[in-house]
């Protein structure tokens, strides 16, 4: 339960795209506290499991880092099996008293899979190979779907263009963009 007077640290757009055997994941760099931008170049993308996976987060930064650490532990325990590690993290997140309070979401991509892990314990694998989380996610998702359908752009370029579109619309998204690829 959120404390009603506690300012919420939020803002972000993270989007991942699978295309032609490659995966790209990118984010903007803005972090806000309440209605104030406190940082423009926050890094929200991490390389995991010997560079085979990329993970991005939206939500409270400390909470997201905690979840990423747990997810890395699960990856090691399950020999890099993305789906199994994601399901086990979601199970823990849903049942553990401490983890249940964490306010974040994760977007994870490999060259073959794209998943969203939510705080409600859901593991979502979109049919179109596009994952998007954060305040500008719907703008970026719409742009990515259109670019996938109507262009031959690479996964990396689709992610970058989608984030640029979100930055033009969403006040919690900026154009300090980081894109990584596996």
UniProtKB/Swiss-Prot annotation:
- Regulation of its activity: Allosterically activated by HslU binding.
EC number(s) reported in the record? 3.4.25.2
Q: Where in the cell is it found?
A: Cytoplasm
Q: Which GO terms describe its cellular component?
A: HslUV protease complex; proteasome core complex
What are the alphabetically sorted keywords of the record? Allosteric enzyme, Cytoplasm, Hydrolase, Metal-binding, Protease, Sodium, Stress response, Threonine protease
Main EC class of this protein? hydrolase
Q: Which reaction does it catalyse?
A: ATP-dependent cleavage of peptide bonds with broad specificity
Recorded GO molecular functions are: metal ion binding; threonine-type endopeptidase activity
- Which GO terms are recorded in the biological process aspect for this UniProt protein? proteolysis involved in protein catabolic process
Active-site feature positions: 12
Entry keyword Protease: yes
State where Na(+) binds.
167, 170, 173
Q: Describe the subunit structure.
A: A double ring-shaped homohexamer of HslV is capped on each side by a ring-shaped HslU homohexamer. The assembly of the HslU/HslV complex is dependent on binding of ATP.
Concerning its family, UniProt says: Belongs to the peptidase T1B family. HslV subfamily.
Role description: Protease subunit of a proteasome-like degradation complex believed to be a general protein degrading machinery.
Q: Which PANTHER family match?
A: ATP-DEPENDENT PROTEASE SUBUNIT HSLV (PTHR32194:SF0), METALLOPROTEASE TLDD (PTHR32194)
Q: What protein name is recorded for this chain?
A: ATP-dependent protease subunit HslV
Q: What species is this protein from? A: Chlorobium luteolum (strain DSM 273 / BCRC 81028 / 2530)
